[in-house]
A protein has these predicted regions:
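Non-catalytic, conserved peripheral segments adjacent to functional cores
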Residues: 1-104, 123-125, 132-153
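Short beta-strand His + acidic residue motifs that chelate non-heme Fe in jelly-roll/DSBH
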Residues: 109, 117-122, 130
Length: 153
């Protein structure tokens, strides 16, 4: 697995080693020891899987009381995935990074706790799978508008 820190260094792009031939492919999608070395010591407690159609925008969601870290990947289709730093004491507060994730590039994005997260589906359909560091709590769910002028996505 290759780990690449992005313009906001706490957000990390993961690119797996894919072994493929005419029969198909194999790839390792997560290894705790490597993840801790490159991204920090986090425990994942919930996995989610969503499906969306072209043009659907999900997010940008974040939490205040129990912020979720998310390791996200696309297993079908393509999305433009965005993380916005919502940590008020961070030197990158209000800044964002975005990456295309797809079934073809097989890349994943680590979005740490304290970030707003969302994605836009750019293919006909997309299936999105992600691990979370805390449980979903609808009472602690907040949204940031994708076109917020101060963020400037």
């Amino acid at each position: 697995m290759e780990y690449q820190k992005l313009a906001i260094p706490d957000v990390v792009l993961l690119t797996p080693k894919v072994f493929g031939d005419e029969r198909g492919f194999f790839m390792e999608t997560f290894r705790q020891s490597e993840f801790e070395q490159h991204c920090g010591n986090y425990q994942f407690v919930q996995d989610n899987h969503s499906s969306s159609t072209k043009g659907i925008l999900r997010g940008l969601h974040y939490q205040h009381q129990k912020p979720q870290g998310k390791l996200v990947r696309v297993v079908k289709g393509e999305v433009f995935d965005v993380a916005v730093d919502m940590r008020q004491n961070s030197p990158t507060f209000g800044q964002w990074v975005g990456e295309y994730l797809s079934e073809y590039n097989k890349r994943m994005l680590w979005v740490p706790p304290g970030f707003a997260h969302g994605f836009l589906v750019t293919s006909e359909t997309a299936e999105f799978v992600y691990k979370c560091t805390d449980y979903y709590n609808p009472g602690d769910e907040y949204s940031l508008l994708w076109n917020d002028e101060t963020v400037g996505i």
